[in-house]
Amino acid sequence: MPKNKGKGGKNRRRGKNENESEKRELVFKEDGQEYAQVIKMLGNGRLEAMLFDGVKRLFHIRGKLRKKVWINTSDIILVGLREYQDNKADVILKYNADEARSLKAYGELPEHAKINETDTFGPGDDDEIQFDDIGDDDEDIDDI
């Protein structure tokens, strides 16, 4: 039997994510790129998102982002449109909440874009649930 002369497993190779606190430079869209908001995660590196011009498309998460950057619903992403397939596109970059707010402040994202909320797209009134008190407060459980 050979001796274990290694220095650890895959967790050691993976290292620590110390660069999360560092701010990166804000990336704006170029030709052939658009901003979108994630509607639904489909699995297998795919997701459904709505471009801010109103078109819903199927998106593919590229290999560089696949297991390193976690994308959730209502995230703002930068996508590269495909010239040969109109209904599909590729995810290039995921913006965090601060970067998305900056994009909105610069006028890159429309005003109706909701950044940190689960309800996506469109100016909608906030539906609040109202509960009515049906029973008497004096009524005791033992009296029923």
From Swiss-Prot:
Q: Where is this region: Disordered?
A: 1-26, 114-144
Q: Which UniProt keywords apply?
A: Cytoplasm, Initiation factor, Protein biosynthesis, RNA-binding, tRNA-binding
Instruction: Give the signal peptide range.
Output: none
Where in the cell is the protein located?
A: Cytoplasm
Residue ranges, compositional bias (Basic and acidic residues): 16-26
What sections of the sequence does the record tag as coiled-coil? none
List the InterPro entries hit by this protein, alphabetically.
Answer: NA-bd_OB-fold, RNA-binding_domain_S1_IF1, TIF_eIF-1A, TIF_eIF-1A_CS
Q: Which regions are flagged for Basic residues bias?
A: 1-15
The terms under GO molecular function for this entry are:
translation initiation factor activity; tRNA binding
Highest taxon of source: Eukaryota
A GO cellular component entry from the record: cytoplasm
Matching entries from PANTHER family are given as: EIF-1A (PTHR21668)
Q: What does this protein do?
A: Component of the 43S pre-initiation complex (43S PIC), which binds to the mRNA cap-proximal region, scans mRNA 5'-untranslated region, and locates the initiation codon. This protein enhances formation of the cap-proximal complex. Together with EIF1, facilitates scanning, start codon recognition, promotion of the assembly of 48S complex at the initiation codon (43S PIC becomes 48S PIC after the start codon is reached), and dissociation of aberrant complexes.
What protein name does the entry list?
A: Eukaryotic translation initiation factor 1A
Q: Which species is the source of this protein?
A: Oryctolagus cuniculus (Rabbit)
- Native organism taxonomy: Eukaryota, Metazoa, Chordata, Craniata, Vertebrata
